[in-house]
Amino acid sequence: MLIETTTARPSTPRPSSPPVRKPQTIFVDSFSKEVFDQTYRFATESDINERHFKVALDIASVERPEIQNFWANKFVDLLEDFKFVPGGRITSNAGTGLKGTTYINCFVSGFRGEDQDSMTSIMDELRRQAFILKSEGGYGFCADVLRPRGTFVNGIGGDSPGAVKLLEMWDTQSGVITAGSGLERKEKKGKNKIRKGAQMVTLSIWHPDIVEFIGAKQTAGRLTKFNMSVLVSDRFMKAVENQLPWTLEFPDIDGAREEYRKHWDGNLDSWKAKGYPVVAYKTYEKASELWDLLMKSTYNRNEPGVLFIDTINKLNNLYYAEHINATNPCGEQVLPVGGSCLLGSINLTKFVNSKAADWDYEKLRTYIPIAVRFMDNVNDRSQAPLPEQLENMQQKRRIGLGILGYGSALMMLKVRYGSDKALKMTEELGSFIMNEAYRASADLAREKGAFPLYDADKYLAGQFVRRLQPETRAHIKKHGIRNSHLLSIQPTGNSSVLANNVSGGLEPIFMAEYTRTVIQPFAPSGLAVPTNVNWSAKTFTTTGGTSKWEWIKEGDENLLRTRFDDAVWKFDQSRGLLKETQIKDFAVRYHESLGTWDSRADWASTAYNLKIEDHVRTMEVLSRFVDAAMSKTVNVPADYPYEEFKRLYMDVFKTGTIKGCTSYREGTMTAVLAATSSSSTGEELSGIPRTKAVSRPKSLDCEIHTLTSDGHKWVVLVGLLDGDPYEVFAMKQNRLHLPSTVKKGQLLKEKPGRYNLLTDDGWALGDIRTFFESDEQEALTRMISTALRHGADIEFIVSQLLKSEGTINSFAKAIARTLKGYIKEIKTIRCSECNSKNIKLQEGCFTCLDCGSSKCE
């Protein structure tokens, strides 16, 4: 039985509104406070309440002066205790006065105008990308407009490098343009965190470069700043099912040069409908061959993702005014060129009715309209990187109201994720939120006007809008609607941690509790720090406190451990000072406070215990009530059969409501698959696969390790490219005179064969080669570095080094022990902020369980 909506709405404000009160939010988890301090705190703000107060005032400032305080108080109430968590850019930027930033998490851009495939157009789009990244926004676009590899270019008399090669320009620029430097400031003027650009690129299944696109990230280091998705049409999926042929094709540039210049915009169906000619590049006897290639890449490497583009456009509320071919980086917003993703989430842990073992619908009815108004105001309050994006925001007024804490809330109610009861509750919840949000938007239209592109007849005829309750549709017909789209299930990596560590978005609880380990650059006051440590003899002294340390063994390593300030502290020879704390999901804390926690109960199942069907059925149920899209990762075990994996994607397509699918198969992020010059275009060579080394930039981040091997003290320098070991140098400590406290720096390549070290503490060493004791040492580091650059398995390198004998033994062991620390980190995903391997992949985004860094917010 679906829950009926009513017309109850927040009361009309009086002309004399009361002063705005301060919120009273409390962190119950130290991890949440750290995420606030590192990610959202602005300048000298005292706490989360000051941030929320500024956000509420700022978002209410677009209201009429006489009611601004009324709505500011409503927004304070909404934000208080994390009942509603705005998108990360709103929490971070609203109320700061920073005019170069935006409140919008992501933007979809793309080529426009005439001659879209020209170098001028490409450079124009790169300029747009730069402005989006500079403003802290994520970036998405479709590469369909780019001509295929090998196409003759008349103007230069040569061949085009193709769409995938050109993407390297976007990839490189994304690595350069970040918001933040990583340097500490003496004055607290702004934020504490570097925000790196997130990107999504899409390419259609008909494009002649699609095979190269599918295999692009199987080459180590290639297009690492992109998420990649293939646009799959209904026609292609039917060809796969019915074993029909499939042709890769592109406009006939020579046969319709003027039409190509004026009318080619990447929409092949539109091009062909106008009668313009195309060129067939390759025909697969069966479309399933190409589908199999895509599925194998996704199975083995988790990329590219798959987007069902016809489903996206058929269910688009603005089907009559726009065409969609791209998404934001995490896929929860399917958008046209110029589109923006304005995000916010209802925290379901604050809307549970424990007595009824159900959702608190009356409380939801109160707060959903306030959340819709809050988000609608952002369209008027936020800056945008480019004028066309601001125009898009105000013409369409899209918002993306979502949920977080879904998995935690179910666990609070003792309902197993994916169970029949959970699905029934989810169906009722989805319908309720959808109808309440649309009615709230219609109320706003009555007060403030409908969005400018609203066409009543066409809008109400839309496939998604027809799913609304008759009363809701009648309300829209009478008053119009303020926002073209209202709903989106987004990644909430940082946001869910900020909200006292609830589960993210639609995901189940990843782990009920776990140990968080964080490298500490400085010791807190009162903690004694080990010094003069002899790891073999197990002797040390301490400075700075009275803490008592004890020796323990983890694996084959000796470590020191103590307890201080309700945490376990460790000290090891490669990572230095470490802090360990126990992190618990919000639902676990809730049950512990009631004395009802039972980790063995069926309702306490986490992501590790769930079946694939639990994920897919949950997605299918909620997708019926979401007008934009959902960012949700289907986690599958390492031994999940490939044929069942393919069937999973076909089943998702057949729902007709899920707009895309992303999966993560356990253990598959590691593989750096061998690629040759021809394998990137889909051809396979026999014999031993050869990989091309990733080019070395002039400067590499460097981690500095000090250790003892067979009685000799060594310093090992590991150069890192995108967080992975790229090169290594090792020399005796007494030749370097480098303090053991120095842990990080930069390896600078001055010229071929000459490398200099500049540490973060200001030490500088010129020409590292001069510090080797012998030619054998230099030769061995060269060979190890060569193997690393070509993607050799680190575990294999370590095993070979440990077999060394003779005079080189101590030197080889020192390098082996150092590289051993990187084995597990390479075999899993590593955090780009702290290099932790303690990572979860959910909702299409990576979240570090140690430092809280999230690729998506």
Question: Where are the model-predicted features located?
Answer:
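Acidic/polar, glycine-rich intrinsically disordered N-terminal extensions of enzymes
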Residues: M1-Y103, D265, S270-K272, Y276, ...
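Active-site cavity-forming subdomains of large catalytic enzyme subunits
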Residues: I3, R9, S17-K22, F27, ...
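Function-dense linear segments that define catalytic or interfacial modules
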Residues: A56-I67, L78-G155, D159, A163-M169, ...
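Internal maturation/activation junctions in enzymes
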Residues: P251-D252, Y367-L390, Q394, R398, ...
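Catalytic alpha/beta core of large soluble enzyme barrels
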Residues: E332-Q333, N379-D380, G462-V465, H475-R482, ...
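Short, Gly/Pro- and small/polar-rich lid/capping loops
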Residues: R473-H475, A675-L720
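Short, cysteine/histidine-rich loop/knuckle motifs that typically chelate Zn2+
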Residues: C831-S836, D850
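Cysteine-rich micro-motifs
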Residues: G844-S854
